[in-house]
Amino acid sequence: MTEPSIVITGLALRLPGADDQEQFWKLLIEGEDRTRPVSRQRRALAGRPDWDDVIGEVEGIEMFDAEFFGIDEDEAVFMDPQHRMVMELAYEAVCDAGLLESKRTAERRYSVYMAMSTNPYYPLVSRHLDEHGPAGVHPRTIMNLHP
């Protein structure tokens, strides 16, 4: 009996200084370090004015097309930025693999595997949960809400 094949056919990413594969490879080849001192805005949002560190920040996290994903704008505002990015990246990975153009997509099984790091977003918005509900806010929900 033969084992089913596993093929990686699509890739999507968001990293500091790289929004796609080409930018990522360029950073690798050039050996560029995209970490920067924590910005004043980031320190203020975190409530840590004395935060003296370097971090790698992904740009454009506020650029989310809630309507495209069928999400109410009010809910999208409270969604963890990583959750919004997961939705975009899952879609981009499927597109990169050419699965949306395939007439056989419905006949096969596909998976999107992701990795993410922790972040302080949940504590920043948790006081608003009663008002807007928990969907898309708690980090444990991020990988579970996508068909």
Predicted regions and their residues:
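Cys-dependent condensing catalytic cores that perform Claisen condensation/acyl-transfer
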Residues: 1-147
